[in-house]
Amino acid sequence: MPTLPNDLRLLEAESIAILRETAASFTKPVLLYSIGKDSGVLLHLARKAFHPSPVPFPLLHVDTGWKFREMIAFRDATVRRLGLTLIVHRNEEGHARGIDPIRSGSALHTRVMKTEALRQALDRHGFDAAIGGARRDEEKSRAKERVFSIRNAAHAWDPRDQRPELWRLWNPRIQPGESVRVFPLSNWTELDVWRYVAAQSIPVVPLYFAAERPVVHRSGALIMVDDGRLPLNPGETPEMRRVRFRTLGCYPLSGAIDSDAATVEDIIVEMRASRTSERQGRLIDGDEPASMERKKREGYF
């Protein structure tokens, strides 16, 4: 495998140190696995951090029931290939109520099937540290997130109740009832992630690569018709377009972009010319002003 460029080598070393610090400091950590490119890089780093031993904590996937079919297939194949321990949790109460991203709306769907589901899973299994792949460059509320981000007993985030983190002086100590979200990729950018994927040959979901896919125009975004549950509006017909996804979530809430980038190298070239956020395709970010910060205060990823 080629030698990493110096900037990626430093980012890798920092992330591995954070993962080892987490394993040493907490009783029951868990790695949040959302199946996207950041989760893939995070999992690769975790395997490196503890090699030749297995990853010393399980993976947790909060399944809303509305992920792309290719994402679920990729998740299951990855777990089998690497021999990982995966916990899949769904908010059964929300499912019984029929909460979904179409009829219920993105805000309610996200709160019930993602935020409440995550809190349920953390409480049920007693996890005191949840390791996630969020990065500070993604969104302004994440820009002020600490590497070790304190959550109260209700898993809520208060930006005023966070500790200083000077240089690499992390503070993983918590009070009884508290937990933390740990973000080893805090200082990475989207371009860093893709360069690392290329350098380390990390597999990613094929949806990241351009291909002909059936899409409809919804809320200013190109929404892929992934299965028969997406109702078509009167006069609406899916069209085949060459698109890819910069970010992946529930398929009715994830907008595609027109693209010809069919390889990781193509994506890197595209990223170098891009002047827009990767989260432009996430419909949940536009629910209301400061919606991401409000979601995080409620316990979102």
Swiss-Prot record:
UniProt-listed InterPro entries: PAPS_reduct_dom (IPR002500), Rossmann-like_a/b/a_fold (IPR014729), SO4_adenylTrfase_ssu (IPR011784), Sulfate_adenylyltrnsfr_sub2 (IPR050128)
Source organism, top-level taxon: Bacteria
Class in the EC hierarchy, top level: transferase
EC number(s) stated in the UniProt entry for this protein: 2.7.7.4
Keywords of this entry: ATP-binding, Nodulation, Nucleotide-binding, Nucleotidyltransferase, Plasmid, Transferase
Record's signal peptide: none
Region Disordered, residue ranges: 278-301
One Gene Ontology MF term: sulfate adenylyltransferase (ATP) activity
Catalytic reaction annotation: sulfate + ATP + H(+) = adenosine 5'-phosphosulfate + diphosphate
Entry's Gene Ontology BP terms: hydrogen sulfide biosynthetic process; sulfate assimilation
UniProt KW ATP-binding keyword: yes
Matching SUPFAM superfamilies: Adenine nucleotide alpha hydrolases-like
Keyword Nucleotide-binding part of the UniProt annotation: yes
Disulfide pattern: none
Subunit text: Sulfate-activating enzymes, NodP and NodQ, may be physically associated.
Function text: Proposed to provide activated sulfate for transfer to nod factor.
Family statement drawn from the similarity comment of this UniProt entry: Belongs to the PAPS reductase family. CysD subfamily.
Protein name per UniProt: Sulfate adenylyltransferase subunit 2
Biological source species: Azospirillum brasilense
High-level lineage: Bacteria, Pseudomonadati, Pseudomonadota, Alphaproteobacteria, Rhodospirillales
